[in-house]
Structure formats: C-alpha cells, structure tokens
Amino acid sequence: MTDHSEFDSVSGKTTTGHEWDGIKELNTPLPRWWVICFYLTIVWAIGYWIVYPAWPLISSNTTGLFGYSSRADVAVELANLEKIRGDKMAALGAASLADVEKDPALLALARAKGKTVFGDNCAPCHGSGGAGAKGFPNLNDDDWLWGGTLDQIMQTIQFGARSGHAKTHEGQMLAFGKDGVLKGDEIVTVANYVRSLSGLPTRKGYDAAKGEKIFVENCVACHGDGGKGNQEMGAPNLTDKIWLYGSDEAALIETISQGRAGVMPAWEGRLDPSTIKAMAVYVHSLGGGK
C-alpha cells in the first residue's frame, strides 16, 4: 500500500494533509501516557455512576450500589447534635435566671447560644454587636427604656414593645404638633428646653421659662420631674447624652411634632423559652445590664 504521508521539513513530522491558505497542520499524536490516563478517567466515571448516587430521575435519583447519601449523613449528625444541645438547653430552661448566673457552665452555654440567636434575629435592627442605630436602642450602654435587669430584659424580649402581644410594653411619644396640642413656636421652645436638660446649646433668645412651663404641662407626666424618664412607661431619660432619634433641634422638633412609636417584636411563640432566656443572658452581658 502506497504511503502518501507528507513530512514537514522543519519538524520532521507528518502533516494531516489539510492546508488552509498555505498553512498546514502537523499530525502530532497525544502522548500515550495522557491517552491512557484519559481512558482511565472514563472508566472511573462510569464506576462512580454505578457505585454512588449520580443520575437524577423524575422524583428522585439513582442511589448507587453503595446506597451512600451525604444528606443522610448530615441528618444523622444534626440529630446527634440536636440531642446533645437538647439536653443542655433543657437544663438551661429548667434553671432560673439567677441560677444561670451562678452556674459557669450554664452561663457559658446561654451566652454562646444567645450570641448565635442574636445574630440571626436581632442584629438586623440592633447591629451585630448591639450598638444600635437611629430608632434602635444601643444595648451596650446602661440606658434602658424598659429596664436593664435580667428579668426586665427577658420580659422585653418575650413580649416586645407595641408588638400587639397581650403582655407587650405599651406607651408611645405623643404627636403634639400633628394632634394640635402644641403650636409650632411652642414646639421649638420646648425642644430647646429639652436640649438644655442635657447641657446641649440652645437657640439664641429662646424663652427658657416658657419652655419649662410647656414641659411641665405636657411632658412631666411621662418623662418625670426634671426629665429623668420613667421605665414603667418606656419614657427615656432626657438629661443624659443618649438619644434614640437624635438630639439636634430638627430631630427633637420632629419627635415632638410627629411622635415616636417604634415597635419591638414579641419573640414568644417564635423562639422557645430556653432560647429566649439565652438571648436575655447574652444581651445582659453586652455591658449595660444591671
């Protein structure tokens, strides 16, 4: 049989016999070791299809000869972990808050569990570290609208504030301007008076006596004499440097005119009692708990 192979004079290799615009292609076979490895991978893939789950079906998939399922393994591990956690969380749930504080193991468990739950449920409003934001209280300081003891914190988490729960904290900042209780100039005057309570500068020439009179007639009932606040009503202390909605004149005018009524959701029914207790312990440990 006649061999019509054409050799390339430079490389000494045969060409494929094809030519495009004067360009010829060398016939360079793949290395034998590479070809062997390639076929071995095909054999391995076929074996994998047979042994392990591989092909999707209409409502399931092929299970393979080994019947292996990583999902089943994960489910078993999660069940084991849940059992371990369940026993520990049951002990946490059975203990009082005072007992949790006295037991190092339960306290560590509550803080660890509380931190995780806080990150999943509370961080979107209060921040990952509980530092808060405008309209969302800072949980690291010692300024508490509804009280900062362990029991008070747990009650707030359970029932929320203005959440609609039967046991929720009620109380809101009235809209003195919107409801026509105070006129515009009166709101400006009392806003400056409120700023003066915490040592903030006031508008030049404002009538302090008039501001105090307006405050006594309209604000003392909730915020108390001197503006020290009232935790039973969720009324903030107006004499410190902590302001939930801002301390500048414009922010205070808006607050007095339009009112404030932020909502804290009730977590009872969403989280189990042990988890709520753990969250209360964690929040209390952030630095501002009393």
Curated annotation (Swiss-Prot):
PROSITE patterns: CYTC. It holds the Pfam family Cytochrome_CBB3. SUPFAM superfamilies: Cytochrome c (SSF46626). It is found in: Cell inner membrane. Residues 54-290 are periplasmic. Changing residue 125 to S: 85% decrease in cytochrome c oxidase complex activity and assembly defects of the complex. 85% decrease in cytochrome c oxidase complex activity and assembly defects of the complex. Residues 1-32 are cytoplasmic. Heme c 2 binds at residues 173, 219, 222-223. One of its GO terms (molecular function) is heme binding. Binds 2 heme C groups per subunit. The keyword Cytoplasm does not apply. Its main location: membrane. Changing residue 122 to S: 85% decrease in cytochrome c oxidase complex activity and assembly defects of the complex. 85% decrease in cytochrome c oxidase complex activity and assembly defects of the complex. Heme c 1 binds at residues 122, 125-126, 264. Belongs to the CcoP / FixP family. NCBIfam families: ccoP. This is Cbb3-type cytochrome c oxidase subunit FixP. It comes from Bradyrhizobium diazoefficiens (strain JCM 10833 / BCRC 13528 / IAM 13628 / NBRC 14792 / USDA 110).
